[in-house]
Amino acid sequence: MINMRKAIFILSLTTILFSCNVEKSSNASSSDEAKNFIQSQFDFFTNSSLEEAQNTFSSDAVLIGTDAAEYLSGWDEIKPSIVGQLAIEDPKFMTRDLNIFMSEKGDMASYTQVLDFTFNIGGEAGEVKNVRNSGAIKKIDGQWKVVQIHWSIGVQGQAVEYEY
């Protein structure tokens, strides 16, 4: 009888321990998926594909660009900007310093990263370094989508001066 109680206790304890580990594995899997999506989110540029771009953004995504006029809400506003940007030839993104913050449910993440961007446009080579990129992605109907993306380029000086 004591051996049976011991066996039931050990079996129960093992079940509890393994069931607690499921969420961590699921969250680790979601984190890997999110990281892969973030790292591939600019593939539509490389492939010059408007269709891929539309599949990358949610229909109600917000894009905040480096130009003062670039505060775009929803795919209908984002699309013309993307069409213009797809004229860029041979785009290459070199990213670094990626930080990802996952939601507890593993269905949403925010991220920050820095990137360098090289390209050709009209036969002229171009390069932009140290672009700060952040955003939020969400799993919608089983697919990761950009729901918000923000681009900025640091300039010397502060818009509002303060000590730090």
Would you name each region that the model predicts?
Residues 1-7:
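Positively charged n-region of N-terminal signal peptides that target proteins for export
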Residues 7-17:
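Sec-dependent N-terminal signal peptides
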Residues 20-51, 55-56, 160-164:
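Short, low-complexity N-terminal intrinsically disordered segments enriched in polar/charged residues
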Residues 41, 53-54, 61, 74, ...:
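Hydrophobic pocket/interface hotspot
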Residues 62-73, 86-90, 104:
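A short gly/proline-enriched turn/hairpin at secondary-structure junctions
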Residues 67, 104, 113-117, 135, ...:
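A mature extracytoplasmic/lumenal domain signature
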Residues 79-123:
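Surface-exposed, charged secondary-structure patches
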Residues 130-158:
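Short beta-strand edge/turn micro-motifs at domain boundaries
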